[in-house]
């Protein structure tokens, strides 16, 4: 399964307008893929909308990326978006495809999006080590997806769902205390290029 995580910088006070426009844009007849997440940042770089879309094939992802880049009104936000970055990913092969909350049972509304740099040669070891550790960690709080970038610097992004900020803090502390997280040996393959963003589900987000 392939994914795009698009990041738009928006003027203050336009998040609701943008979320509605994004839903409409993703449902247009010519659109490829499926809208899965639409989140607005709360902690980290502010005034950013994060849009997660899923694709059955790389060809569909590339076609939709081209449609968006060539559009005069990308995501229906051309008049307000100040920046747009589209990052392409492939899900870790052992992970289930991302599904909306109504199907998966995974709910936020708080989502943490973490991106880690990977050292050369570290992609497959990272995938394998996470396969061993995520099931136990998922039982503490659900991992929505772990996915490796297919362009740009070596990196992967993982997304986690929590009912509240407090629940996130407790879940992470519990996982460390139980010795189930981070994956044993996993950090050795990572660089110090790490980011974490806390974002809240918008009213139109399938991952609510």
Go through the PLM ranges and name each one.
Residues 14-35, 60, 66-74, 120-145, ...:
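Short amphipathic alpha-helical segments
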Residues 62, 169:
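DNA-recognition helix of C2H2 zinc fingers
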Residues 94-97, 117-123:
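Short acidic/polar capping segments at secondary-structure boundaries
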Residues 56-60, 164:
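Alpha-helix N-cap recognition
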Residues 35-50, 72-110, 140-157, 161-163, ...:
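Glycine-rich beta-strand-turn "strand-cap" elements at beta-sheet edges
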Residues 3-5, 9-14, 204:
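Short, extreme N-terminal leader segments that mark the start of a protein/domain
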Residues 2-7, 18, 49-53, 109-115, ...:
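Short, structured motif recognition centered on aromatic/hydrophobic residues
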């Amino acid at each position: 399964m392939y994914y795009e995580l698009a990041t738009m910088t928006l003027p203050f006070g336009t998040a609701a307008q943008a979320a509605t426009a994004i839903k409409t844009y993703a449902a247009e007849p010519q659109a490829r893929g499926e809208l899965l997440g639409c989140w607005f940042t709360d902690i980290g770089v502010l005034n950013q909308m994060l849009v997660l879309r899923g694709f059955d094939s790389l060809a569909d992802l590339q076609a939709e990326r081209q449609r968006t880049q060539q559009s005069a009104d990308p995501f229906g936000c051309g008049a307000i978006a100040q920046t747009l970055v589209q990052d392409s990913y492939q899900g870790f092969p052992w992970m289930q495809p991302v599904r909306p909350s109504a199907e998966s049972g995974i709910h936020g509304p708080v989502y943490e999006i973490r991106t880690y740099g990977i050292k050369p040669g570290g992609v497959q070891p990272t995938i394998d080590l996470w396969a061993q550790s995520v099931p136990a960690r998922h039982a503490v709080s659900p991992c929505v997806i772990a996915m490796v970038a297919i362009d740009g610097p070596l990196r992967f992004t993982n997304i986690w769902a929590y009912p509240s900020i407090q629940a996130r803090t407790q879940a992470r502390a519990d996982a460390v205390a139980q010795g189930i997280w981070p994956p044993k040996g996993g950090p050795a393959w990572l660089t110090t290029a790490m980011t974490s963003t806390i974002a809240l589900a918008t009213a139109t987000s399938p991952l609510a």
